[in-house]
Amino acid sequence: WLSNEKWERFKELNVSLDGKNILDVGSGNGYYAFRMLGEGASKILCLEPNLMHVSQFLAINKMMSSESIRMVPERLEDMALKTTTFDIVFSMGLLYHQRNPSKHINDLKEMVKEGGKLIIETIILPDECGLFLEPDLSRYASMPNVHFVHSDIGCKTLFEESKLFLRNESVAIKTTNQEQRKTKWMPFKSFESALNPKNNNETIEGYPAPKRKFYVLEK
């Protein structure tokens, strides 16, 4: 992934991170946490259960020597965190992997202070697909463990049910094989192989090709 492209899309939403206490759920190797730090965040707690990603973070932070970012190798649902602790909570690229999307949204909401923000970034489908799609065999665009892919209206319905207020949203951006591509460090199958070779508006499974979108929500 060219992770900087996603970050630039977030920055267009003009959400101030200056002085904020942030929770980044499913943070990968911590790339976005370091970008948050660069935007003036005070403290960032990263939750990432994948130990390879945790190892990458530790290697990066060995050079960065930041005491403002901590990473814990746990899932949100397994943590006994104090609720209403964070000014901003991020969930990027997680919603479609949830067996219970409503619970995920509510678990995130519990971590946000009153008046704080929840940032959701996810794949969305066209509204004509209904509120959500349940992919056969839980596979979508060659990704395993994809249980629900929501439309824009489906996402907004989830947020309304959780009594979250939509304050801003990005445009929906189609994922390209320039943003997610093979490199000499990652020579395996990538996004290009996830699309129908005869119609790049469809996934290899025949579903609408993914677009990604940010939502800025307030508690």
Language-model features: where?
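Conserved catalytic loop of SAM-dependent methyltransferase domains
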Residues: 163-193
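Conserved SAM-binding loop of SAM-dependent methyltransferases across substrates and taxa
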Residues: 29-40
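Conserved class I S-adenosyl-L-methionine
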Residues: 20-28
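Short, glycine-/aromatic-enriched active-site segment of Class I SAM-dependent methyltransferases
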Residues: 123-146
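A short SAM/SAH-binding and catalytic strip from SAM-dependent methyltransferases
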Residues: 87-101
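Short alpha-helix
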Residues: 147-163
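A short acidic, Gly/Pro-enriched loop at the edge of an enzyme's catalytic core
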Residues: 79-89
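A short glycine-rich, Lys/Arg-flanked "PGG" loop and its adjoining helix->strand segment in the class I
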Residues: 102-117
